[in-house]
Amino acid sequence: QNRVMSVLGDDTAKARMAAAVLLTAPGVPFLYYGEEIGMIGTKPDEQIRTPMQWTAAENAGFSTGKPWIAVKPNYDTSNVETQNAAAASLLSYYRSLIHLRNDHEALRVGDYTQLSTDNSRVYAFLRHSAHENILVLINLDAAPAADYKLSLTPGALSGTLNPVDLLTK
């Protein structure tokens, strides 16, 4: 299959949204090398298996020799070194999501309850374990979702709630 960033049209906002879905949904998340920095590539397989883009240097810092296949043209910005230095990079976002998942049992092994909203562009679900409840809201649209309503059934979210933004706290 093609690399995620190529499927998403090289759109970093969409890649961030896809990462949020992947790392908050149930199951074992799988990342193909370079996905966390936005590497691109489409079939045939050789174009997906290009060298890891470590730096903006020649051959993306992968080798001082001549690689059997050239690195992708976006290696000057989509590389580990450049994104390590940028707090708002795709790599930093992946790291934040991975830390969030590792720090919260509900995201690792908790149950999943899909919630309904009156806005089809807002994906809402609850991840819950014996020790915590995490409400996940993901805006699937480029435009802000400022006005929407959630339908919550009695249960894990009943009573007084004190919401906390775990990702940007």
Placement of each model-derived feature along the sequence:
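Active-site clefts of carbohydrate-active enzymes
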Residues: 1-10
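Active-site phosphate/pyrophosphate- and oxyanion-stabilizing loops and adjacent acidic/basic residues
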Residues: 19-20
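Soluble non-cytosolic domains of exported or imported proteins
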Residues: 12-13, 88
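Carbohydrate-interacting/catalytic domains
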Residues: 24-31, 37-169
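Catalytic and substrate-binding clefts that recognize carbohydrates or anionic sugar/phosphate headgroups
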Residues: 16
